[in-house]
Amino acid sequence: IPMLPQGVNIAHPDKLFIGGRWVSAHSGRMLEMVSPNTEAVVATCAEADEADMDAAVAAARAAFDSGPWPTTPPAERVAAFRRMVAHLETRVPELAAAWTAQMGGLASFAGPMHGGSVMGLAQIADFAESFEFVQQRATVGAAAGIVVHEPVGVVAAIAPWNGPFGIMANKVAYALLTGCTVVMKPSPETPLEAYIIAEAAEAAGIPAGVVNLVPSHREAADHLVNNHGVDKVSFTGSTLAGKRIAQVCGERIARYTLELGGKSAAIIRDDFPTEAAAKLLTGTLNMMSGQVCAMLSRAIVPRARHDELAAAIAAEMKQVVIGHSDEHRLL
Protein backbone atom coordinates (compact mmCIF):
# COMPACT_ATOMS: atom_id res chain seq x y z
CA ILE A 1 0.00 0.00 0.00
CA PRO A 2 1.60 3.32 -1.02
CA MET A 3 2.28 5.92 1.67
CA LEU A 4 1.91 9.70 1.37
CA PRO A 5 2.68 12.59 3.75
CA GLN A 6 -0.24 14.20 5.52
CA GLY A 7 -1.92 16.80 3.31
CA VAL A 8 -0.67 15.31 0.03
CA ASN A 9 -3.35 13.72 -2.18
CA ILE A 10 -1.81 11.97 -5.17
CA ALA A 11 -4.14 9.54 -6.93
CA HIS A 12 -1.63 6.94 -8.18
CA PRO A 13 1.69 7.09 -6.31
CA ASP A 14 2.16 3.37 -6.99
CA LYS A 15 2.09 3.96 -10.77
CA LEU A 16 4.15 5.62 -13.49
CA PHE A 17 2.62 8.06 -16.00
CA ILE A 18 3.46 6.85 -19.51
CA GLY A 19 1.59 7.56 -22.72
CA GLY A 20 -1.30 9.25 -20.96
CA ARG A 21 -1.97 6.29 -18.64
CA TRP A 22 -1.07 5.40 -15.06
CA VAL A 23 0.77 2.08 -15.38
CA SER A 24 2.54 -0.28 -12.99
CA ALA A 25 6.33 -0.21 -12.91
CA HIS A 26 8.00 -3.08 -14.78
CA SER A 27 9.91 -4.26 -11.71
CA GLY A 28 7.14 -3.69 -9.20
CA ARG A 29 9.62 -1.97 -6.90
CA MET A 30 8.82 1.12 -4.82
CA LEU A 31 10.98 4.10 -3.86
CA GLU A 32 10.98 5.23 -0.23
CA MET A 33 11.13 8.90 0.79
CA VAL A 34 12.86 9.41 4.15
CA SER A 35 12.13 12.43 6.35
CA PRO A 36 15.25 14.43 7.27
CA ASN A 37 13.46 15.30 10.52
CA THR A 38 12.93 11.79 11.86
CA GLU A 39 14.69 9.48 9.37
CA ALA A 40 11.36 7.65 9.05
CA VAL A 41 9.81 6.69 5.72
CA VAL A 42 7.10 9.28 4.99
CA ALA A 43 6.13 8.33 1.44
CA THR A 44 6.53 5.68 -1.24
CA CYS A 45 6.07 5.68 -5.00
CA ALA A 46 6.69 3.48 -8.02
CA GLU A 47 10.30 3.00 -9.15
CA ALA A 48 11.04 2.94 -12.88
CA ASP A 49 13.67 0.66 -14.38
CA GLU A 50 15.32 0.57 -17.80
CA ALA A 51 12.27 -1.00 -19.46
CA ASP A 52 10.05 1.76 -18.08
CA MET A 53 12.47 4.40 -19.36
CA ASP A 54 12.30 2.90 -22.84
CA ALA A 55 8.50 2.84 -22.69
CA ALA A 56 8.35 6.49 -21.60
CA VAL A 57 10.73 7.59 -24.36
CA ALA A 58 8.76 5.58 -26.93
CA ALA A 59 5.54 7.28 -25.79
CA ALA A 60 7.12 10.73 -25.95
CA ARG A 61 8.68 9.91 -29.34
CA ALA A 62 5.35 8.79 -30.78
CA ALA A 63 3.59 11.86 -29.38
CA PHE A 64 6.18 14.10 -31.01
CA ASP A 65 6.52 12.30 -34.36
CA SER A 66 2.85 11.43 -34.88
CA GLY A 67 0.85 13.41 -32.34
CA PRO A 68 -0.74 16.85 -32.58
CA TRP A 69 1.32 18.72 -29.98
CA PRO A 70 4.34 19.91 -32.05
CA THR A 71 2.06 21.32 -34.76
CA THR A 72 -0.54 22.77 -32.41
CA PRO A 73 -0.66 26.57 -32.82
CA PRO A 74 1.41 28.26 -30.09
CA ALA A 75 -1.64 30.11 -28.75
CA GLU A 76 -3.43 26.80 -28.19
CA ARG A 77 -0.39 25.35 -26.43
CA VAL A 78 -0.35 28.39 -24.16
CA ALA A 79 -4.05 27.93 -23.37
CA ALA A 80 -3.49 24.28 -22.46
CA PHE A 81 -0.50 25.17 -20.30
CA ARG A 82 -2.50 27.85 -18.52
CA ARG A 83 -4.99 25.13 -17.57
CA MET A 84 -2.07 23.23 -16.05
CA VAL A 85 -1.04 26.31 -14.08
CA ALA A 86 -4.61 26.84 -12.84
CA HIS A 87 -4.63 23.26 -11.56
CA LEU A 88 -1.26 23.72 -9.87
CA GLU A 89 -2.50 26.86 -8.13
CA THR A 90 -5.02 24.69 -6.28
CA ARG A 91 -2.27 22.26 -5.26
CA VAL A 92 0.17 24.72 -3.66
CA PRO A 93 -0.60 23.50 -0.10
CA GLU A 94 0.11 19.93 -1.23
CA LEU A 95 3.33 20.94 -2.95
CA ALA A 96 4.42 22.69 0.24
CA ALA A 97 3.56 19.70 2.42
CA ALA A 98 5.36 17.28 0.09
CA TRP A 99 8.52 19.41 0.05
CA THR A 100 8.61 19.82 3.83
CA ALA A 101 8.12 16.09 4.41
CA GLN A 102 10.61 14.82 1.82
CA MET A 103 13.31 17.46 1.72
CA GLY A 104 13.02 18.99 5.19
CA GLY A 105 12.40 22.53 3.94
CA LEU A 106 10.84 24.90 6.45
CA ALA A 107 7.05 24.82 6.50
CA SER A 108 7.00 28.58 7.08
CA PHE A 109 8.83 29.06 3.77
CA ALA A 110 7.25 26.23 1.76
CA GLY A 111 3.92 27.93 0.99
CA PRO A 112 5.32 31.23 -0.30
CA MET A 113 8.07 29.39 -2.17
CA HIS A 114 5.71 27.14 -4.11
CA GLY A 115 3.12 29.85 -4.60
CA GLY A 116 5.84 31.97 -6.15
CA SER A 117 6.95 29.09 -8.37
CA VAL A 118 3.43 28.68 -9.76
CA MET A 119 3.24 32.44 -10.39
CA GLY A 120 6.49 32.10 -12.31
CA LEU A 121 4.89 29.50 -14.57
CA ALA A 122 2.14 31.98 -15.43
CA GLN A 123 4.83 34.49 -16.40
CA ILE A 124 6.47 31.89 -18.65
CA ALA A 125 3.09 31.43 -20.35
CA ASP A 126 2.89 35.21 -20.87
CA PHE A 127 6.33 35.15 -22.49
CA ALA A 128 5.37 32.27 -24.79
CA GLU A 129 2.18 34.09 -25.77
CA SER A 130 4.13 37.10 -27.01
CA PHE A 131 7.02 35.18 -28.59
CA GLU A 132 7.18 35.20 -32.39
CA PHE A 133 7.86 31.63 -33.48
CA VAL A 134 8.08 32.79 -37.10
CA GLN A 135 10.23 35.89 -37.60
CA GLN A 136 11.05 37.84 -40.73
CA ARG A 137 14.61 39.10 -41.01
CA ALA A 138 16.04 41.82 -43.19
CA THR A 139 18.24 40.50 -46.00
CA VAL A 140 20.47 41.89 -48.72
CA GLY A 141 18.71 41.92 -52.08
CA ALA A 142 15.19 40.83 -52.91
CA ALA A 143 15.14 37.51 -51.05
CA ALA A 144 13.02 37.24 -47.90
CA GLY A 145 14.61 35.97 -44.71
CA ILE A 146 12.38 33.93 -42.41
CA VAL A 147 13.44 32.28 -39.14
CA VAL A 148 11.13 29.53 -37.89
CA HIS A 149 11.59 28.35 -34.29
CA GLU A 150 10.76 24.65 -34.18
CA PRO A 151 10.57 22.24 -31.22
CA VAL A 152 13.69 20.18 -30.50
CA GLY A 153 11.82 16.92 -29.92
CA VAL A 154 11.80 14.62 -26.90
CA VAL A 155 13.22 16.23 -23.76
CA ALA A 156 14.49 14.28 -20.75
CA ALA A 157 13.94 16.59 -17.76
CA ILE A 158 16.06 15.56 -14.76
CA ALA A 159 15.61 17.55 -11.55
CA PRO A 160 17.40 17.47 -8.16
CA TRP A 161 16.02 16.90 -4.67
CA ASN A 162 16.37 20.38 -3.17
CA GLY A 163 13.95 22.28 -5.44
CA PRO A 164 11.94 19.44 -6.96
CA PHE A 165 8.87 21.41 -8.03
CA GLY A 166 10.19 24.73 -9.28
CA ILE A 167 13.09 23.26 -11.24
CA MET A 168 11.08 20.45 -12.83
CA ALA A 169 8.06 22.65 -13.56
CA ASN A 170 10.23 25.21 -15.35
CA LYS A 171 11.82 22.52 -17.52
CA VAL A 172 8.40 21.14 -18.41
CA ALA A 173 6.98 24.62 -19.06
CA TYR A 174 9.53 25.67 -21.67
CA ALA A 175 9.47 22.25 -23.34
CA LEU A 176 5.68 22.13 -23.64
CA LEU A 177 5.25 25.72 -24.76
CA THR A 178 7.73 25.22 -27.60
CA GLY A 179 6.01 22.02 -28.77
CA CYS A 180 8.33 19.42 -27.28
CA THR A 181 7.35 16.25 -25.44
CA VAL A 182 8.81 15.44 -22.04
CA VAL A 183 10.01 12.54 -19.90
CA MET A 184 10.22 13.71 -16.26
CA LYS A 185 12.86 11.97 -14.14
CA PRO A 186 12.66 13.44 -10.63
CA SER A 187 15.10 12.71 -7.84
CA PRO A 188 14.34 9.48 -5.95
CA GLU A 189 14.48 11.48 -2.71
CA THR A 190 11.75 13.96 -3.74
CA PRO A 191 9.55 12.63 -6.57
CA LEU A 192 6.08 13.59 -5.30
CA GLU A 193 6.03 17.06 -6.84
CA ALA A 194 6.50 15.55 -10.31
CA TYR A 195 3.41 13.41 -9.69
CA ILE A 196 1.42 16.58 -9.09
CA ILE A 197 2.81 18.07 -12.33
CA ALA A 198 1.74 14.93 -14.21
CA GLU A 199 -1.73 15.13 -12.68
CA ALA A 200 -1.93 18.79 -13.73
CA ALA A 201 -1.05 17.85 -17.32
CA GLU A 202 -3.71 15.15 -17.28
CA ALA A 203 -6.32 17.51 -15.84
CA ALA A 204 -5.46 20.15 -18.45
CA GLY A 205 -6.07 17.75 -21.33
CA ILE A 206 -2.47 17.70 -22.56
CA PRO A 207 -2.36 14.97 -25.27
CA ALA A 208 -1.24 11.46 -24.29
CA GLY A 209 2.52 10.93 -24.36
CA VAL A 210 3.40 14.62 -24.23
CA VAL A 211 4.18 14.43 -20.49
CA ASN A 212 5.58 11.25 -18.93
CA LEU A 213 6.81 10.48 -15.40
CA VAL A 214 9.44 7.89 -14.43
CA PRO A 215 11.00 8.31 -10.94
CA SER A 216 14.15 6.21 -10.59
CA HIS A 217 17.61 5.75 -9.17
CA ARG A 218 20.80 6.56 -11.08
CA GLU A 219 21.09 3.35 -13.12
CA ALA A 220 17.77 3.81 -14.88
CA ALA A 221 18.41 7.53 -15.30
CA ASP A 222 21.68 6.74 -17.07
CA HIS A 223 19.73 4.47 -19.40
CA LEU A 224 17.35 7.36 -20.15
CA VAL A 225 20.21 9.68 -21.09
CA ASN A 226 21.65 6.98 -23.38
CA ASN A 227 18.35 6.44 -25.20
CA HIS A 228 18.69 7.66 -28.80
CA GLY A 229 15.02 8.60 -28.79
CA VAL A 230 15.85 11.52 -26.49
CA ASP A 231 16.74 14.66 -28.46
CA LYS A 232 17.69 16.85 -25.50
CA VAL A 233 18.62 16.35 -21.85
CA SER A 234 17.86 19.18 -19.42
CA PHE A 235 19.73 18.39 -16.21
CA THR A 236 20.08 20.16 -12.88
CA GLY A 237 22.25 18.44 -10.30
CA SER A 238 25.78 17.47 -9.36
CA THR A 239 28.86 18.30 -11.41
CA LEU A 240 29.86 14.62 -11.40
CA ALA A 241 26.58 13.52 -12.97
CA GLY A 242 26.69 16.47 -15.36
CA LYS A 243 30.08 15.37 -16.68
CA ARG A 244 28.66 11.93 -17.42
CA ILE A 245 25.65 13.40 -19.23
CA ALA A 246 27.86 15.68 -21.32
CA GLN A 247 30.01 12.71 -22.30
CA VAL A 248 27.05 10.54 -23.30
CA CYS A 249 25.25 13.29 -25.20
CA GLY A 250 28.47 14.32 -26.93
CA GLU A 251 29.04 10.79 -28.18
CA ARG A 252 25.61 10.63 -29.79
CA ILE A 253 25.41 14.33 -30.77
CA ALA A 254 22.39 15.09 -28.61
CA ARG A 255 21.62 18.50 -27.16
CA TYR A 256 21.98 19.04 -23.45
CA THR A 257 21.71 21.81 -20.87
CA LEU A 258 23.54 21.46 -17.56
CA GLU A 259 22.97 23.45 -14.37
CA LEU A 260 25.60 22.12 -11.99
CA GLY A 261 27.14 22.72 -8.59
CA GLY A 262 28.96 25.91 -7.72
CA LYS A 263 30.32 27.97 -4.88
CA SER A 264 28.36 31.22 -4.66
CA ALA A 265 30.39 34.17 -3.43
CA ALA A 266 29.47 37.41 -1.70
CA ILE A 267 31.81 40.36 -2.22
CA ILE A 268 31.78 42.64 0.84
CA ARG A 269 33.17 46.08 0.05
CA ASP A 270 34.77 48.50 2.50
CA ASP A 271 31.67 50.68 2.72
CA PHE A 272 29.10 47.91 3.37
CA PRO A 273 27.85 47.75 7.01
CA THR A 274 29.17 44.75 8.92
CA GLU A 275 25.91 43.82 10.67
CA ALA A 276 23.91 44.02 7.45
CA ALA A 277 26.46 41.80 5.69
CA ALA A 278 26.34 39.25 8.52
CA LYS A 279 22.52 39.09 8.45
CA LEU A 280 22.49 38.68 4.68
CA LEU A 281 25.09 35.92 4.68
CA THR A 282 23.59 33.91 7.54
CA GLY A 283 20.13 34.28 6.02
CA THR A 284 21.26 32.47 2.88
CA LEU A 285 23.36 29.95 4.84
CA ASN A 286 20.32 28.80 6.79
CA MET A 287 17.84 28.89 3.92
CA MET A 288 16.77 25.30 3.15
CA SER A 289 19.36 24.12 5.70
CA GLY A 290 22.10 25.47 3.46
CA GLN A 291 21.16 23.08 0.65
CA VAL A 292 20.51 25.55 -2.14
CA CYS A 293 22.43 27.12 -5.00
CA ALA A 294 21.60 30.65 -3.80
CA MET A 295 23.47 30.10 -0.53
CA LEU A 296 26.35 32.59 -0.18
CA SER A 297 28.77 30.06 1.27
CA ARG A 298 31.89 32.06 0.37
CA ALA A 299 32.64 35.65 1.28
CA ILE A 300 35.37 37.79 -0.26
CA VAL A 301 36.24 40.64 2.13
CA PRO A 302 39.06 43.13 2.67
CA ARG A 303 41.68 41.57 4.97
CA ALA A 304 41.24 44.39 7.46
CA ARG A 305 37.55 43.46 7.90
CA HIS A 306 37.97 39.68 8.16
CA ASP A 307 37.90 39.29 11.94
CA GLU A 308 35.12 41.84 12.39
CA LEU A 309 32.86 40.13 9.85
CA ALA A 310 33.64 36.62 11.13
CA ALA A 311 32.63 37.68 14.65
CA ALA A 312 29.40 39.25 13.38
CA ILE A 313 28.49 36.10 11.43
CA ALA A 314 29.20 33.94 14.49
CA ALA A 315 26.92 36.16 16.58
CA GLU A 316 24.13 35.81 14.01
CA MET A 317 24.54 32.03 13.83
CA LYS A 318 24.19 31.74 17.61
CA GLN A 319 20.66 33.14 17.28
CA VAL A 320 19.53 30.42 14.88
CA VAL A 321 16.73 28.28 16.34
CA ILE A 322 17.08 24.56 15.60
CA GLY A 323 14.01 22.38 15.14
CA HIS A 324 11.98 20.19 12.81
CA SER A 325 11.04 21.66 9.45
CA ASP A 326 7.30 21.32 10.09
CA GLU A 327 7.46 23.72 13.03
CA HIS A 328 5.96 26.96 11.71
CA ARG A 329 7.77 28.97 14.40
CA LEU A 330 11.04 28.42 12.54
CA LEU A 331 11.85 31.09 9.96
Give the positions of each predicted feature.
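Residue-level signal for inorganic ion chemistry
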Residues: 39, 77, 99, 179, ...
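Terminal low-complexity tails and localization/encapsulation signals of metabolic enzymes
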Residues: 1-45, 79-83, 131-158, 257
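Short linear capping/connector segments at secondary-structure termini
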Residues: 98-106, 136-141, 326-331
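Structural signal for hydrophobic packing residues in well-ordered secondary-structure cores
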Residues: 64, 68, 85-92, 96, ...
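ALDH superfamily catalytic-core signature
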Residues: 240-331
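Rossmann-like NAD(P) dinucleotide-binding subdomain of oxidoreductase/dehydrogenase enzymes
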Residues: 133-276
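Glycine-rich loop-to-alpha-helix module at the N-terminal edge of alpha/beta enzyme cores
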Residues: 42-131
